[in-house]
C-alpha cells in the first residue's frame, strides 16, 4: 500500500532531532510493508528567524528534496506569519502547494494520507485527499489541542479540519478526552512507541556514591530555549540540591542526533523533566530504557508508568529535589518495564488494524 505522510515537522539534514516522533511513525508504516513518502511543508523564512524556536533550526536553507532513513522527503515552502494573525493567508498558501506536491509525486499515487499535526498542514492533506478521493488520518501530538484551540485565530480551523478527517489519532488519553469534549467522534488513541535501539538498552542503575558529597549529573532532556520546557525550574532544583551538599552538573540537549542523546542518557544519574506542557514525553521513556531514572512533574502521561516517588505534583524546586534524592535511594535491581502499549510491536498492530478498518470503510 502507498501511504503519504504529511507533517509540519520532520528531521532535516541539518537538524536530525526535529520531529523524530514522525520519522518513528514512518518507520512503523514501512515495517508493515507499505511504501511511504513524506511531505514536510516548511515556512518561508530567513536564517536569523530560525532562532525563534529550536524546531525551526535548519529550515531556512533546507533542501527541497532529500532522503531520511531511505524515505523520500519533499519540503515545499508556504507563507505563514508568527502567531498566525492572518490564517487565511496560510490556508491559501498551503492549498497552493498541492500542485507542487502532485508534480513531485508524478505517477505515484497514495492510497492513504497520514497527517501529523492539524494546523496548518491538514489543509494540504485534506485538499489532496479530496483530489484523489482517498481517506486521510490526522495525528494530534498535543500542540493543536493544548495551544491551537486556545488561539482565536486558529481554533475554528483546527476544529473544522479535525472533523473533516476520516480518523483522528491522539497520542494520549487526555488528548482523546479533549477531542470528545470538542464533539469529535472519530478518534482513537495510539501512543508513540519507544524507539531506543538494543545497543543502548539497559536496566536502571543504583546510586553508589557518597551521599550529598558526590557529583550528580542531571540531564535536562530538552532545548532550554523552549519556554514550555521550563528550564528555569530545573536550574532552581539543581540549586536546591547544591544547598544540600551535592555537586551538580546539568546537561541539556540541543538538536543532537538520537544516538548522542541516548549516550548522554546512559551516563546521567537522573533525568529531570519540568515541562509546563507535554502530551507523551518520549524522553522520559527513552531515559528509562537507557537505564537512567526519571524525576518528573506530573505532566502528560508520565503518571501511567513512572513510580509514585518519581512524580511531583507541584512545580516546586524543593519537592523536585526531594524526589531526586528518593530516586537515588531506591533499589533498581529488579529493573523497570514500560507498559506494553508503548512497545513497537503493540503500536505496529494498532496501526495495522486502523489501516485495515479505514480500507474496509472506503
Where in the sequence are the language-model features?
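N-terminal subdomain of nucleotide-sugar transferases
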Residues: 1-61
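Conserved donor-binding/catalytic core segment of Leloir-type glycosyltransferases
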Residues: 4, 209-229, 235-238
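Donor nucleotide-sugar binding/catalytic pocket of nucleotide-sugar-dependent glycosyltransferases
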Residues: 40, 158-202
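Acidic anion/phosphate-binding donor-loop and adjacent secondary structure
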Residues: 149-152, 180, 195-213
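A charged, aromatic-enriched C-terminal amphipathic alpha-helix characteristic of glycosyltransferases
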Residues: 206, 228, 329-360
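Aromatic "clamp/platform" in nucleotide-sugar-dependent glycosyltransferases that forms part
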Residues: 276
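Short hydrophobic beta-strand element within catalytic cores of glycosyltransferases
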Residues: 293-296
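Conserved acidic donor-binding segment of nucleotide-sugar-dependent glycosyltransferases
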Residues: 309-318, 325-330
Amino acid at each position: 500500500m502507498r501511504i503519504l505522510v504529511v507533517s509540519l515537522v520532520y528531521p532535516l539534514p541539518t537538524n536530525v532531532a526535529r520531529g523524530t516522533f514522525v520519522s518513528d511513525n514512518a518507520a512503523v508504516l514501512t515495517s508493515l510493508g507499505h511504501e511511504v513518502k513524506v511531505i514536510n511543508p516548511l515556512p518561508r523564512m530567513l536564517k536569523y528567524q530560525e532562532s525563534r524556536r529550536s524546531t525551526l533550526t535548519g529550515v531556512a536553507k533546507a533542501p527541497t528534496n532529500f532522503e531520511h532513513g531511505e524515505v523520500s522527503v519533499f519540503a515545499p515552502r508556504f507563507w505563514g506569519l508568527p502567531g498566525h494573525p492572518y490564517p487565511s493567508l496560510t490556508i491559501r498558501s498551503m492549498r497552493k502547494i498541492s500542485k507542487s506536491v502532485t508534480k513531485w509525486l508524478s505517477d505515484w499515487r497514495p492510497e492513504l494520507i497520514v497527517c501529523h499535526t492539524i494546523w496548518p498542514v491538514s489543509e494540504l492533506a485534506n485538499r489532496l485527499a479530496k483530489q484523489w478521493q482517498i481517506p486521510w488520518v490526522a495525528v494530534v501530538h498535543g500542540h493543536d489541542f493544548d495551544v491551537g484551540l486556545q488561539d482565536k485565530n486558529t481554533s475554528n480551523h483546527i476544529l473544522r479540519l479535525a472533523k473533516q478527517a476520516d480518523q483522528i489519532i491522539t497520542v494520549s488519553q487526555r488528548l482523546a478526552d479533549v477531542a470528545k469534549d470538542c464533539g469529535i467522534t472519530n478518534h482513537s488513541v495510539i501512543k508513540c512507541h519507544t524507539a531506543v535501539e538494543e545497543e543502548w538498552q539497559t536496566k536502571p542503575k543504583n546510586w553508589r556514591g557518597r551521599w550529598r558529597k558526590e557529583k550528580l549529573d542531571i540531564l535536562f532532556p530538552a532545548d532550554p530555549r523552549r519556554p514550555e520546557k521550563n528550564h528555569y525550574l530545573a536550574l532552581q532544583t539543581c540549586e536546591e540540591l547544591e544547598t544540600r551538599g551535592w555537586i551538580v552538573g546539568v546537561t541539556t540537549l540541543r538538536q543532537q542526533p538520537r544516538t548522542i542523546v541516548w549516550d548522554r542518557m546512559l551516563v546521567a544519574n537522573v533525568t529531570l523533566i519540568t515541562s509546563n506542557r507535554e502530551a507523551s514525553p518520549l524522553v522520559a521513556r527513552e531515559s528509562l530504557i537507557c537505564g537512567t531514572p526519571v524525576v518528573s512533574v506530573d505532566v502528560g502521561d508520565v503518571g501511567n508508568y513512572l513510580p509514585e516517588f518519581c512524580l511531583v505534583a507541584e512545580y516546586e524546586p524543593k519537592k523536585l529535589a526531594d524526589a531526586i534524592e528518593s530516586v537515588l535511594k531506591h533499589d533498581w535491581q529488579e529493573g523497570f518495564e514500560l507498559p506494553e502499549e508503548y512497545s513497537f510491536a503493540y503500536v505496529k498492530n494498532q496501526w495495522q488494524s486502523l489501516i485495515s478498518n479505514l480500507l474496509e470503510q472506503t
